[in-house]
Swiss-Prot record:
InterPro entries assigned: Ribosomal_uS19, Ribosomal_uS19_bac-type, Ribosomal_uS19_CS, Ribosomal_uS19_SF
NCBIfam families listed in its UniProt record: rpsS_bact
Family, similarity comment: Belongs to the universal ribosomal protein uS19 family.
Job of this protein: Protein S19 forms a complex with S13 that binds strongly to the 16S ribosomal RNA.
Database matches in Pfam families: Ribosomal_S19
A GO cellular component annotation in the UniProt record: small ribosomal subunit
Protein name per UniProt: Small ribosomal subunit protein uS19
GO biological process: ribosomal small subunit assembly; translation
A molecular-function term among this protein's GO annotations: rRNA binding
Keywords carried by this UniProt record: Ribonucleoprotein, Ribosomal protein, RNA-binding, rRNA-binding
Matching HAMAP family: Ribosomal_uS19
Amino acid sequence: MPRSLKKGPFIDLHLLKKVEAALEANDKRPIKTWSRRSTVFPEMVGLTIAVHNGKQHVPVYVTEDMVGHKLGEFAATRTYRGHAADKKAKR
């Protein structure tokens, strides 16, 4: 179920402060965050945000199409290595 409109979109306060500081300083370095639950705001467009996937920080360049989505959607947490090969087919 989607979030109520009267509440508005969620963003962690510490991430918002980092974004505002990067915009003010015109800093192009990636902003490191563990907040996968934060919503992408229009102010973030053009910034690179390093989102933690449980193992490492994945750099995500924010575009206009990403606004309204969650940061965690752009950093996959699981790797698919494929199913085991059929032993009979190898012979």
